[in-house]
Amino acid sequence: MSTPISYQLAFGTYEDALRMVGVPSEPRTAGTVVSAARIQMFAATVQDGNPSYWDPDFALQTWGGLVAPPGLLMGWLTPLPWEPSGRPPVSAIAIRVPLPGTTFINAANEAEFPLPIVEGDRLTVVEEVVSVSPEKQTKLGVGHFIETVDTFTRQDGAVVATNWNTLFRFTPAAS
């Protein structure tokens, strides 16, 4: 029997959440390698004709292979909904931070790519909670800002991307 992906939020106190700050996650490796099919499906979806995504000869000479679009970064580590091993999938670290609040919204995102991600790479990510704000009152509701950093490496250990993200986890204000 399969184990469904659980995107259920972890609940706890602000103090519980602070215990996660600065503690790197265990490395999590993608279930599949970066592939031309996914690169081109993404590029087709956004109608991007960049030859780095479509022309194998151009991409090989320029990048060492078809290059992954930056917008696809988080998709490489999205867990498969089922694996034959029965290993349960792991949700992103921000969902595992124990806090009050039933809703979250992305507030900011910034990524840096020191090296290209190319067809055939197998990515691994280490996630870390950088900070959790004290409780804030906003027009959306009362909650906490959670800042995370994800460091992506390829099979040789080289860092290919770093992604900084800020989520607001909150209880919606009454209408």
Question: What does each of the following model-derived ranges do?
Answer:
Residues 1-20, 24, 108-175:
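HotDog/MaoC-like acyl-thioester-processing domains
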Residues 2-108, 174-175:
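Hot-dog-fold acyl-thioester-processing enzymes
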